[in-house]
Amino acid sequence: MVGVPHRLLSSPCGMRIKDTMYKRYIKRLFDVFVAVVALLLVGWLLVLVAVFLHFANKGAGTFFLQDRPGKDGRIFRIVKFKTMTDERDVEGNLLPDGQRLTKVGRFVRSTSIDELPQLLNVLKGDMSLIGPRPLLVQYLPLYTPEQARRHEVRPGITGWAQVHGRNAISWQEKFKLDVWYVDHCALMTDLKVLWLTVVNVLKRKDINSATSATMEFFTGNN
């Protein structure tokens, strides 16, 4: 298996949380149904945003592709709208994120539209609508066994941690919320997360600021 060692994918007592009928079967059907409906409803918007980003990004491309760890640590390629240019300084180094973030990109980020292409990841089975966010591959060896339990479910476009602080909480708090979700995954929980996600997006709550395009890196100690 590629990704997280097996020892990191079990609970501290060595026992996995038993799958429920919802977790095992219904959640996937729910994901596919909602993703298809969402793409039919917002497909026109994705095309429009892609056109604007094509020009705003100054040739840097429209989509951002990156390897991320999914369920059981298996690596997949996530797709997002690219919101920054590839502008560099005189020494050839990329400019700080805040300077490369375009006006169009700032709007796309503030409304979380940049995450919508991940509906394709959901249809492919790499992701779920709701689940712990897929983080960087380089974080895998830094997790404690308890933190690594976040990989027992498919990663999500949004999740329990995202509607309870998102970028305003510490990594430790975020991982605790992720593991809580793993143990309490249910239809009503997912519906609540979807509702709170819509509310937070409309309020522009806990979104990265225009001058801070990305959050701090996880080091294993922060």
What are these regions (language model features)?
Residues 18-86, 193-222:
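A hydrophobic, helix-centered structural microdomain
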Residues 61-100, 158-176:
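Short, glycine-rich, amphipathic interfacial segments at transmembrane boundaries or analogous
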Residues 7-36, 66, 166-187, 197:
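Glycine-rich flexible loop motifs, especially short His-Gly-Gly/GGXG/HXGH segments used as catalytic or interaction
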Residues 97-154, 194-197, 201:
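A short, structured surface patch at a secondary-structure boundary
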Residues 25-28, 44, 100, 112-118, ...:
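An acidic site on a long C-lobe helix of protein kinase domains
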Residues 2-4:
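Acidic, Ala/Val/Gly-enriched low-complexity intrinsically disordered segments
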Residues 49, 63-64, 93, 130-132, ...:
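Short, hydrophobic secondary-structure boundary micro-motifs
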Residues 150, 154-155, 160-209:
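Cytosol-/stroma-facing membrane-proximal "stalk/adaptor" domains immediately downstream
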